[in-house]
Amino acid sequence: MWNLRITPLSFGAACQGIFTSTLLLSCVTVPLVCTIVYDSCLYMDINASRALANVYDLPDDFFPKIDDLVRDAKDALEPYWKSDSIKKHVLIATHFVDLIEDFWQTTQGMHEIAESLRAVIPPTTTPVPPGYLIQHEEAEEIPLGDLFKHQEERIVSFQPDYPITARIHAHLKAYAKINEESLDRARRLLWWHYNCLLWGEAQVTNYISRLRTWLSTPEKYRGRDAPTIEAITRPIQVAQGGRKTTTGTRKPRGLEPRRRKVKTTVVYGRRRSKSRERRAPTPQRAGSPLPRSSSSHHRSPSPRK
């Protein structure tokens, strides 16, 4: 077992030195990247901006786990990395891949150390209630140098003689949770950008709109399965491919002779087609010339002869 002979003063100084770099990154860098740098570097149209804002309202279980998310993002970005692309989605997604990967490893390390300390915590020790641990919203309002002091004061107020190992465990759990909540925004932004590279910004915008509509519809009035982006984009891809592979056996519509419509009229109570030849009318008045017969079409001999 460990022989920890540390006074509260040295414990505080040591912990401040250990966690300063981690807290500096987790509490300052992540919010700045997700707000100042992101909002100033990225320009999108109004529809894409609204869809991106709606991403923050989607449930947590909609997004993949951190490990799967980073792996999928790297697969989507690899062709653009090889071609040295400078598209906005490539640049921002690359930044978030590095950010999430580094901070996720740090957070996982905190959890592993905390779990290893659990073995040396006295069995009768009561865990620190969540209300005594600093939350993410509170950490944004506390100066970075005072974060450890505020957390230590809360632990002392819970139990003045709280064991040293249990204090370290409580600090690690609090800071790891702050890191995870800080990375949640970056995780959603990374999902948005690498999917825009895979499917197109317009398709992702349409998909988010349909998904939110499905989520807001009561269960008995909506479909059983949520819409997927593959189902939205597949018909368009198939239609485009079909146009290229058609053999063209059918004549274009514009080159086909238009069939003349046969109009009919009613004459004296019977239907007659205008396209049919009309018969020569019989003389009805006195003095009208008699119609020539078909045999008299040739010219009569001149009377001079």
Swiss-Prot record:
**Taxonomic superkingdom:** Viruses
Query: Subunit arrangement?
Result: Homodimerizes.
Tell me the Pfam families matching this sequence.
Hepatitis_core (PF00906)
Q: Does the keyword Secreted apply?
A: yes
Single GO cellular component annotation?
extracellular region
Q: Where is the composition biased (Basic residues)?
A: 258-277, 295-305
> What's the protein here called?
External core antigen
Q: Region (Disordered): which ranges?
A: 226-305
Q: Which UniProt keywords apply?
A: Host-virus interaction, Secreted, Signal, Viral immunoevasion
Keyword check for Signal:
yes
Q: Which residues form the signal peptide?
A: 1-19
In this entry the propeptide is located at 273-305
> What protein family is recorded?
Belongs to the avihepadnavirus precore antigen family.
The cellular location(s) given in this protein's UniProt record come to: Secreted
Q: What does this protein do?
A: May regulate immune response to the intracellular capsid in acting as a T-cell tolerogen, by having an immunoregulatory effect which prevents destruction of infected cells by cytotoxic T-cells.
- Per the UniProt record, the site (Cleavage) maps to 272-273
Q: Which GO terms describe its molecular function?
A: structural molecule activity
